[in-house]
């Protein structure tokens, strides 16, 4: 037996007329409430003419079962293929006859199948108020019926989900070759009530009757798990939730919230108002207690409980009791005990030379011969001194990068003390580990700012500790005239300053002695695990003036006083002269220079005076 898809056109039309008659006689028209109903008809080239005629007759028959009108159900129709075309919008017609006439006049587009594009159009245009859809606050159900015969050529999942999220209920009707997966992707849940696959024409009649029943009279509240907390209310083709008196619908449109009595502003609560089932009560914020009037709040005095154990003072906070120390004291890690504050601990005091704690404050001191400046922290500078200073810095792996940065900062503090210039103090820097590297020689930089910038740019070497190799490099290269040292006949003092944190991995004795033989005044600064015997072997005599030690890198700053007071030009100073300060040292040198100059000038003047007297004597003798 041939199926309906193979019937002659005359027999098909006769069948459609019979189906339309059955649909009209299946029951009364729907009067349960208004709908905004849009039909989205596939008119792609895959829909054959007699198939499109079937869909047309289906629409006409379904319209005759609806109570259409501007105040009842509004109907709109769009057709789509590769593009979307509005047959008539929701607000166009109020009479069924006008709608039928427009449907019978539709000419198929006969192109592709862009179903996703059509859903986008329905969501943004067809269901807009401009097209005749009623405002959302009127709660008129919006229903989209998609009728298609094939697989979409674009994506439908995302746009269909967006449409459903906007409250559009989607029915997906597939004819013969339609893709079931796409139908299920587009339709609203539950899918068994929103997805229809029509495999033959006789099932179109069955679908029409089922669909009419869905739109007209089904008790969805009774048949579905609606999820309403209080009340479920049927609407044509859908339902909505409502709440009992004294409640309002929550944003999820299912649960109910008690009316906010606190929002009325008459509760009188000092802090917080909390709604209950049929009333409200007051609550205080953390750290406060509710008073007897059940409205006002008072801060809780945690210190009054007597269990805080604070050594000095107890302060009640919202989080509980906290201990506080009196002025000039610091709270210990136990959070209870106090210790007298050492204002000189660390480097924040700002003193250039020495910091002295004094009661609840501190004051700065300068070496003898130098005066404290108006800022109360810095000291006046000595007059120009002539020194060639080479710094040997330990860059071995035991130092570690963070401590190496502290060494660089310490070096720059020494540079701040010096009068760096080509004619004054020249500074060179050598870093050593398993090898030796000249970072910059004596003659490269002529200002303290340039030297400090170069020090900050020095990169950490890591590896071993070859102090002996570094001393050899200093003796043979660093104090050479090629590296910027001044000639020996100028008698410019040569000073070597070694920073190290551990035992050398090579012998230092030979080159430490050689450095002193070459007239280099050696200073040794040890930090952490530095070996005292090696420091004394490196340094010049007396060792108490040339050796400095600090237990760790963070406390090196106290060494500055010793070093700054020791590095001083020695030219022209005789044995036995007591050097009390750098300024006194330079003053003696300057005094000797000026005295010698004055004596030489006086001698020259006396010689000229003698010559003049001899000339006068000769003149007197010739006159006789």
From Swiss-Prot:
Disulfide bond positions: 221-232, 228-241, 243-256, 262-273, 269-282, 284-297, 303-314, 310-323, 325-338, 344-355, 351-364, 366-379
Keywords: Coiled coil, Disulfide bond, EGF-like domain, Glycoprotein, Repeat, Secreted, Signal
Domain EGF-like as annotated: residue spans: 217-257, 258-298, 299-339, 340-380
Keyword Coiled coil appears in the UniProt entry: yes
One GO-annotated biological process of the protein: response to axon injury
GO cellular component annotations of the record: collagen-containing extracellular matrix; extracellular region; matrilin complex
Presence of keyword Zinc-finger: no
Cell compartments where the protein resides: Secreted
Pfam families: FXa_inhibition, Matrilin_ccoil, VWA
Tissue specificity field: Lung, brain, sternum, kidney and heart.
InterPro entries: ECM_Assembly_Org (IPR050525), EGF-like_Ca-bd_dom (IPR001881), EGF-like_dom (IPR000742), Growth_fac_rcpt_cys_sf (IPR009030), Matrilin_cc_sf (IPR036337), Matrilin_coiled-coil_trimer (IPR019466), VWF_A (IPR002035), vWFA_dom_sf (IPR036465)
Principal location class: secreted
Entry-linked SUPFAM superfamilies: Chicken cartilage matrix protein (SSF58002), Growth factor receptor domain (SSF57184), vWA-like (SSF53300)
Signal peptide location: 1-21
Domain VWFA: residue ranges: 36-215, 388-563
Annotated function: Major component of the extracellular matrix of cartilage.
PANTHER family: COLLAGEN ALPHA, MATRILIN-4
Subunit: Interacts with COMP.
Protein name: Matrilin-4
